[in-house]
């Protein structure tokens, strides 16, 4: 049993416990239950309360004696007798069950809506009749006064099947394209159908007329919600004559009063998953809504969360046992969960012992690996030398490895490594010796990194400990895990030769000296029993101020000295680099021509002129051979041409002519620099 406490509400998971491997036979399971205490003490409230693979629907009969569940694979329905706490019967079906309902007080009359459009009517002995509906069905509801079954599905029509006459009646035509869910109010028998457009249509079964239309899509959307599409109705449930709860495909539950089109309250599951089931708990005024991930219980008046359940597997259906605190869920897993919440109500009459048992039980988390078997991978099998056992009964394939008996594993492990116990023993002895050493008087060892800083911190700690007055101990950096890396990682080593450290060190040292002096003065003041404002003896305030100014001058001079030294060192390094550059002799660099290339001189102009006289087709062929032209196909199917343009000969000649003309103009120009004007008449003319 697993116990969880959500919002101060205890939830007991009666299905959680040590499970047995599926490959074991019934005889071995019984033998294991006798030997293993954990298996024997686990709580199996109802025997074989599970499905082969997945359970899709679960319901309780109106008399409370029978629990019926549908699942797969293969499609089947199982009936459990609560008085006997065991399986009463099991029936296999031809197709998966979409929805089923119990029409009688016990299990004698059941209707199954299957995924292949068939509807099966079962009696106490088995299948009574089988018929088909025109469209694929998604939900149905039974109207007790008229014995009519209302089927909804992938159609705009609501099909009516009268069980008294044994024939179909006229269908109800809706405005929707498809209908997901339907329900009938037990008080006044109002029929409601939830559509994919996010609307709820209400019909009167007596007149077969629509009496109301409610748009829930806009009501479920709030200001702080992000909705990608139009929400459709995925769940529908009446509560009393006036209230109706609507669940949407985007994860909202909206509560309505039938007299108004405005919602009383809207609750968001915050997961964005379709609401699959809605139940009401009348005693505490709670709404139990469930999507595939979570089951939430909240107050229908103010929306305050009462508690919530998050199963390990996805939820398909939820059933609340009447007048109790027991909850059943159909999951995407073989085991169907049974939850007991004492805050909701007492345990049912057939398991009243739970009230006394839950007080004594403690939380036992479910084990994911069987204790009697060891999970090993193929690599571990190779290391143990057991690869030849693959395929034998000693190894059971599971996921990416195998299950093997734990006793066999220990034997093989001891044979492969016979000294494992000796190594384990030595390790334990070493741990005991280290624990004993820790109790002795320890000498403080300096760390490998930042030894000077650690020594300084040790000295400050000793000075504080030697003081007479007891002060509150400040946390030490050496013992703080946050600064542990600073004394272990060499990357945090303080470089005392760096420029920043040498400039800051005089200032830091002077500040520490001033701090020590102030501490001594404060100690003297505390020791004296004179007046509070009395100055220290033999030390007036003027002398103290003059001393502080002298200290400031001292560290300023020290900083200047360090700056001067740094400049000198930088100058020396530059001179050394220049000297090294002068001493190094530069050697000529040789370049190797690639294989297949030829050295060409500058006398290829004639060849280029001949090439320019040729046609474009001939030039393209020559350029492709030389490699200066690149033609490639693109992904779309076109071609891409890449080439290099060269200057024309005429353009080059024109540039040379312009250059020659400018030089001639410079030679023929006559300068007027020898002409000078008088200073009084203005600037000289140049």
UniProtKB/Swiss-Prot annotation:
GO cellular component, one term: nucleolus
Chief location category: nucleus
Pfam families attached to this UniProt entry: Beta-prop_NOL10_N (PF23098), NOL10_2nd (PF23097), NUC153 (PF08159)
Coiled coil: 420-470, 555-587, 639-676
Listed Basic and acidic residues bias regions: 551-582, 655-666
Subcellular localization(s) per the UniProt record: Nucleus, Nucleolus
Name of the protein in question: Nucleolar protein 10
Species for this entry: Xenopus tropicalis
